[in-house]
Structures are given as C-alpha cells and as structure tokens.
From Swiss-Prot:
Expressed in salivary glands. It comes from Rhipicephalus appendiculatus (Brown ear tick). This is Japanin-like-RA1. Its main location: secreted. InterPro entries: Calycin.
Length: 177
C-alpha cells in the first residue's frame, strides 16, 4: 500500500517541526556570565546578619569559573560589605558542582567544597549539601527572576529543602555592593 504524496509531505512537515517544539538544554547559571542572587536557603544554614548575597562572574581559569561573592553584614549603619573570589566547576549534566572558597567565605556563608545540583534552568539554581536526601539548600536566581522564581525551581526548593526560608534583595543591597 502506498501513501499518497500529500500524506508523505504532511508527515515530513510534522517531523521536521518537532525540534522547534522542544526546548534547548538550559545553561547552568553558576558557570555563565549572569549575576546570581541568593533568594532562599534552609533555616539550618543560619546566615545570621548576612544579607545581599550576590555572585558576579569574573572569568574562567584552568577549568574553573571565577566569581566574586559579595555580601553584607546587616548590623549597624552603614552595612559592612565583604567580597571574595570563589571558584566553581561543573561538568555538563553532572549531579555535583565543585566549589573553592576562602576561609572567610566558608565561615561567613558556610560554603562547602561540593554541592548537589537539585535543579537548574537558565535563570535559577537550587544547590544542596552532599550529605543526604534532606540536606540544607540554597536558592539562587538571576536579576530577571528576583520577584518571580520559576515554578519548577520554587517547587524543588520548597519540597526538597528542609525548612526553606526566602530572603529579600532590596535596594540597600545594590547600594552596599
């Protein structure tokens, strides 16, 4: 049995349009040039008096992405700012992301050498400790999503992270950067 030429043409048009229906692979925001803002974390991280945690891209070196980690201590006036270089490394589709930070950042922000990538898209990222399934998390977004966290990312943060707390990035953060 032969298909009429019009059916073959219709099948070809349908099949050739399928790639445009799918979305492309998201770009991991921790290794691209976007500025990232910490907008949530697990209560157990106890980031006492730390505000405005912002990570900016600096470049790449020896397979690692260099980023500035800027944050402020919200005690007293004016806020006391802190800045340090961190290094992150992530292999495409890997479940783990490596991080190298200074002792000061490790103390102030309780950073770890490795994180589980729970969820990411082009503009948001949920990281957690490597310990176990219900380990402390952090939620990062680009400026575009400061007021509107993507639904899948938000759901991941809320359901997979113990005692999630949302933080705010207000205008003081940009004044004290």
């Amino acid at each position: 049995m032969q298909l009429p030429l019009s059916h073959l043409l219709a099948c070809y048009i349908l099949a050739s349009s399928i790639p445009s229906w799918t979305t492309s692979t998201p770009i991991m925001p921790a290794i691209n040039k976007e500025t990232l803002y910490l907008v949530g974390h697990s209560r157990s991280l106890k980031l006492t008096n730390v505000a405005c945690v912002i990570s900016t891209y600096r470049g790449q070196k020896d397979g690692w992405v260099e980023r500035n980690m800027n944050y402020a201590f919200s005690v007293g006036k004016p806020w006391r700012g802190q800045s340090s270089t961190i290094h992150v490394q992530w292999r495409p589709y890997a479940a783990l992301m490596n991080a190298r930070t200074s002792d000061i950042v490790r103390h102030d922000l309780q950073t770890k050498p490795q994180y589980v990538v729970r969820n990411y898209d082009d503009n948001s990222l949920v990281l957690s400790d490597v310990k176990d399934e219900s380990s402390p998390c952090s939620l990062w977004v680009t400026r575009k999503y400061l007021d509107n966290i993507p639904e899948t990312t938000n759901r991941t943060f809320y359901h997979q992270c113990p005692e999630p707390i949302y933080t705010t990035i207000d205008e003081k953060c940009f004044e004290n950067k």
